[in-house]
C-alpha cells in the first residue's frame, strides 16, 4: 500500500493533467479586450527528449520517444505530430537539436507564435537536406509572403544539428550550429511587422505537399507528397528555452501589440536578459526567396495554423479572423522544473540559522534553561 502522501500527490498530478487538457481558449488581443493572460515561463529550461516526454509540452499526433529523442512521424494524409509549450516567453532564446524529416512535400517546423499572431519560424523542406527556411510575420499580416529566406543547413536530415532563434526587442537572430545565418531588426522588418508579443513554442512535422492543400502550398513544400515512400520522421533530441522576462503571466495592456504595452505579472519584461543578448549582430539579413506569393493568403488559416499553414489543418478563415489558442495553464501550486517537467512547488528549505541551538542539545538542557527563563 502506498503512503497517503504519495496517493495525494498522484491525485494532484492527475488533476493537473486534466487542467492541462481543459483550459484552452482562443482570443486575439488586437480585436478583443479582456483576453486571458499567458502563462509565463519566466526562467530557463533544458529538455532532454532522450529521457522521454515532459508535461510542459502538450503533444498531439504520432510522437514516440527513445534514446534518439522525440520522433514525429508523418505516415498518411492528415498526420501533423506536434509538441506545443504550455508556457509563453517574452523575448528569449530557443535552441533545438534535431534531424529534419526527409521526403518531398514533408515539412519539419519550429514556430514561435503569439496570441496576436506575431510569428518567428524555421522550416526544413524534406525535398532538400541542405537548407532551412527562416521567416517572420507580425500581427498575422502575410501581405505577399515576401519575408521567407533560405539559409544553408547542410545534411540536416542525416545528423543532429542545433538551431537557435534568439529574440529581443532589438533583433531576431537565426543560427545554424554556431553560425548566424540571418538577422532581423525593427528597422529592417516590414512596417509594424517586427514580432514583439509573448510567444508560445510549437514544433513538429506535417505534409505541405498533401493533395488536399492549395497548389501554392504544395509548390512551396516541393511536393506532392508520396506517402508510399514513407513514413517520414523528424527527430528532436532536445530543446532549451530561456525566457528573457520574469513573472508568472504575461498580459496585453492594450490593443497595440507593442512590446512596451505587455505587462509581466509578478516580474518584469526584459528582467532576465543576458549581457550577450545586448550586442547587435553584424550578419546581414538573408535575401528573400521571392517577391511574389508562394502560399495564397487565406489558405490553412485555422485557429491553430501559422502563416505558412502549420500545423496542417484545412481551413477557410481570412487572416483578420484568425485567433490563436492560448494553451493550457499551470495549476496553482505547481511549477516548471529546469528539466521542463511540471512538478509541485517545493517547500521552502529550513533555515538552520533561525533555530535556537538549545533545540539541538537534547530535552534536559532545553527544559533547564526554560525553567530559569534565561537563554544563551
From Swiss-Prot:
PROSITE patterns: GH16_2, PROKAR_LIPOPROTEIN. GO terms for molecular function: glycosyltransferase activity; hydrolase activity, hydrolyzing O-glycosyl compounds. It is a lipid-anchor; GPI-anchor. Its EC number is 3.2.1.14, 2.4.-.-. Its main location: membrane. One of its GO terms (cellular component) is side of membrane. InterPro entries: ConA-like_dom_sf (IPR013320), GH16 (IPR000757), Glyco_hydro_16_CRH1_prd (IPR017168), Glycosyl_Hydrlase_16 (IPR050546). The active site is at residues 119, 123. Residues 347-376 form a propeptide. Residues 1-21 form the signal peptide. Keywords: Cell membrane, Cell wall biogenesis/degradation, Disulfide bond, Glycoprotein, Glycosidase, Glycosyltransferase, GPI-anchor, Hydrolase, Lipoprotein, Membrane, Signal, Transferase. Glycans are attached at residue 351. Residues 22-229 form the GH16 domain. GO terms for biological process: carbohydrate metabolic process; chitin metabolic process; fungal-type cell wall organization. A lipid is attached at residue 346 (GPI-anchor amidated serine). Coiled coil: none annotated. It holds the Pfam family Glyco_hydro_16. It comes from the Eukaryota. It is found in: Cell membrane. Disulfide bonds join 27-35. It catalyses: Random endo-hydrolysis of N-acetyl-beta-D-glucosaminide (1->4)-beta-linkages in chitin and chitodextrins. Chitin binds at residues 123, 202, 206, 217. Belongs to the glycosyl hydrolase 16 family. CRH1 subfamily. Dual chitinase/transglycosylase that plays a role in cell wall architecture. Chitinase and transglycosylase activities are coupled. Required for the polysaccharide cross-linking at the septa and the cell wall. More specifically, transfers chitin to 1,6-beta-glucan in the cell wall. This is Crh-like protein 4. It comes from Botryotinia fuckeliana (strain B05.10). The gene is crh4.
Amino acid at each position: 500500500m502506498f503512503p497517503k502522501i504519495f496517493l495525494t500527490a498522484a491525485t494532484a498530478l492527475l488533476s493537473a493533467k486534466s487542467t492541462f487538457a481543459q483550459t484552452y481558449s482562443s482570443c486575439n488581443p488586437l480585436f478583443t479586450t479582456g483576453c486571458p493572460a499567458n502563462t509565463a515561463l519566466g526562467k530557463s529550461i533544458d529538455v532532454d527528449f532522450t529521457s522521454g516526454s515532459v508535461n510542459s509540452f502538450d503533444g498531439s499526433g504520432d510522437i514516440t520517444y527513445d534514446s534518439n529523442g522525440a520522433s514525429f512521424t508523418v505516415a498518411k494524409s492528415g498526420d501533423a505530430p506536434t509538441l506545443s509549450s504550455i508556457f509563453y516567453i517574452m523575448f528569449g532564446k530557443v535552441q533545438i537539436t534535431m534531424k529534419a524529416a526527409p521526403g518531398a512535400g514533408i515539412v519539419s517546423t519550429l514556430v514561435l507564435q503569439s496570441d496576436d499572431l506575431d510569428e518567428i519560424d524555421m522550416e526544413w523542406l524534406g525535398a532538400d537536406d541542405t537548407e532551412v527556411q527562416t521567416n517572420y510575420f507580425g500581427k498575422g499580416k502575410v501581405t505577399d509572403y515576401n519575408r521567407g529566406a533560405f539559409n544553408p543547413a547542410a545534411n540536416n536530415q542525416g545528423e543532429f544539428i542545433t538551431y537557435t532563434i534568439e529574440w529581443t526587442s532589438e533583433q531576431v537572430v537565426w543560427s545554424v550550429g554556431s553560425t548566424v545565418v540571418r538577422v532581423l531588426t525593427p528597422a529592417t522588418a516590414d512596417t509594424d511587422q517586427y514580432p514583439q508579443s509573448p510567444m508560445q513554442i510549437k514544433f513538429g512535422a506535417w505534409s505541405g505537399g498533401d493533395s488536399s492543400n492549395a497548389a501554392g502550398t504544395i509548390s512551396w513544400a516541393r511536393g506532392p507528397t508520396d506517402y508510399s515512400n514513407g513514413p517520414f520522421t523528424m527527430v528532436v533530441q532536445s530543446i532549451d528555452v530561456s525566457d528573457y522576462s520574469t513573472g508568472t503571466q504575461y498580459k496585453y495592456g492594450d490593443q497595440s501589440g507593442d512590446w512596451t504595452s505587455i505587462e509581466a505579472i509578478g516580474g518584469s519584461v526584459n528582467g532576465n536578459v543576458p549581457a550577450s543578448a545586448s550586442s547587435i549582430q553584424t550578419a546581414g539579413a538573408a535575401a528573400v526567396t521571392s517577391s511574389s506569393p508562394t502560399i495564397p493568403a487565406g489558405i490553412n488559416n485555422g485557429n491553430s495554423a501559422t502563416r505558412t499553414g502549420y500545423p496542417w489543418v484545412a481551413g477557410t478563415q481570412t487572416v483578420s479572423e484568425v485567433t490563436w489558442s492560448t494553451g493550457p495553464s499551470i495549476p496553482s501550486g505547481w511549477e516548471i522544473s529546469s528539466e521542463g517537467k511540471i512538478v509541485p512547488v517545493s517547500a521552502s528549505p529550513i533555515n538552520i540559522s533561525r533555530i535556537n541551538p538549545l533545540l539541538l542539545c537534547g530535552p534536559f538542557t532545553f527544559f533547564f534553561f526554560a525553567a530559569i527563563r534565561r537563554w544563551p
